[in-house]
């Protein structure tokens, strides 16, 4: 039996982003059905029950927490240092940090390690972060590079950034393994379910969808302004955590901002949209693009980072500062537009490379290569 320890903080706390990556990867590994692989998920606390419950029940999977009722400071210390003692006690053979960081002391305890690095936006674009946060993230990144036996980059863009900003010496330890998407996004959503979700969120009849944190880097204003140039019955629905950035969006009754939407409702919201817009200025990958394509939506994204890797050659890409380009691309993506259905079909073929069984197999092979 091989025991893999996994950093589960984001799995139990984050509804989207890093949390989705972790839950999807763990479930993909479970679906492989390898009876000789045991997963131990290490989290500083139990987090959100509805997120823990998304992990498929399996006898070879177990959540692990610090003992007692530690303070926030002790939880941080446990995750960054003393969790290593628990790994030794639990007989962990390899530890996987899912969010770009690793605890201190793994090498001293002879525990092999893998770290997934999603992006280096805090180094490429520090203007989007607080100064102290940037310093902390950079320290964690450089520590992970020193500590990790292997590094997973979730996109070619991220792989190149790691080499450029972390040094050529780490290049031979990097594996490019894309992230996958949850199976629920490729499953048909029943009409009754759509009706329930539409009523719950008071969704308009026709809308362009955006999913992601509403912050400056995500550039939602570009889509909001573009929608004003579309027919009057086309609305914008944006789903995600809101920041002060939303105050800069146009005041328009065709703009609907949804916060706190559970994962269980997302597929239905995707399925009722006419197009998906992802105008982010910089990403490590862009998993919402794949989710949208899996549901069957045409995608319009922006140039400048790595979104072409996620969306493939049959999505549309525009300048992140050009409202007219975004509006024209969205017009080409509405129901009835010429070539729309063919673009959707070819895009769905493209994202087959991101299916969970292939991703899990690559990650499992990486684990085995270190043991």
Q: Which functions belong to the PLM regions below?
A:
Residues 1-371:
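Carbohydrate transferase catalytic cores enriched for Leloir-type hexosyltransferases
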């Amino acid at each position: 039996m091989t025991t893999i320890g996994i950093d589960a903080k984001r799995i139990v706390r984050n509804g989207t982003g890093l949390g989705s990556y972790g839950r999807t990867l763990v479930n993909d590994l479970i679906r492989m059905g390898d009876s000789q692989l045991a997963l131990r998920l290490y989290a500083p606390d139990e987090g959100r029950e509805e997120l823990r419950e998304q992990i498929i029940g399996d006898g070879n999977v177990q959540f692990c927490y610090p003992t007692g009722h530690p303070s926030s400071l002790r939880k941080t210390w446990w995750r960054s240092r003393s969790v290593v003692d628990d790994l030794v006690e639990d007989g962990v053979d390899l530890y996987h940090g899912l969010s770009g960081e690793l605890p201190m002391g793994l090498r001293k305890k002879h525990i092999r390690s893998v770290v997934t690095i999603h992006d280096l936006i805090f180094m490429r674009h520090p203007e989007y972060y607080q100064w102290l946060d940037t310093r902390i993230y950079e320290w964690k990144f450089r520590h992970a590079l020193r500590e990790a036996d292997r590094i997973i980059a979730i996109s070619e863009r991220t792989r190149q950034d790691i080499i450029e900003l972390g040094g050529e010496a780490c290049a031979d330890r990097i594996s490019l393994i894309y992230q996958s998407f949850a199976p629920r996004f490729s499953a048909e959503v029943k009409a009754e379910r759509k009706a329930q979700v539409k009523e719950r969120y008071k969704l308009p009849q026709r809308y362009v969808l955006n999913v992601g944190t509403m912050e400056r880097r995500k550039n939602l204003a570009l889509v909001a302004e573009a929608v004003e140039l579309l027919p009057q019955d086309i609305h914008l629905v944006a789903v995600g955590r809101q920041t002060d950035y939303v105050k800069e969006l146009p005041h328009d009754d065709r703009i609907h901002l949804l916060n706190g939407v559970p994962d269980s409702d997302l597929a239905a919201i995707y399925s009722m949209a006419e197009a998906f817009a992802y105008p982010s200025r910089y990403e490590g990958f862009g998993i919402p693009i794949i989710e949208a394509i899996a549901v069957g939506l045409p995608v319009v994204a922006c140039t400048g980072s790595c979104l072409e890797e996620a969306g493939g050659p049959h999505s549309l890409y525009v300048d992140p500062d050009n409202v007219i380009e975004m509006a024209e691309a969205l017009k080409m993506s509405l129901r009835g537009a010429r070539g729309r259905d063919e673009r959707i079909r070819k895009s769905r073929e493209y994202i087959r490379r991101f299916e969970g069984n292939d991703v899990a197999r690559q990650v499992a092979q990486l684990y085995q290569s270190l043991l």
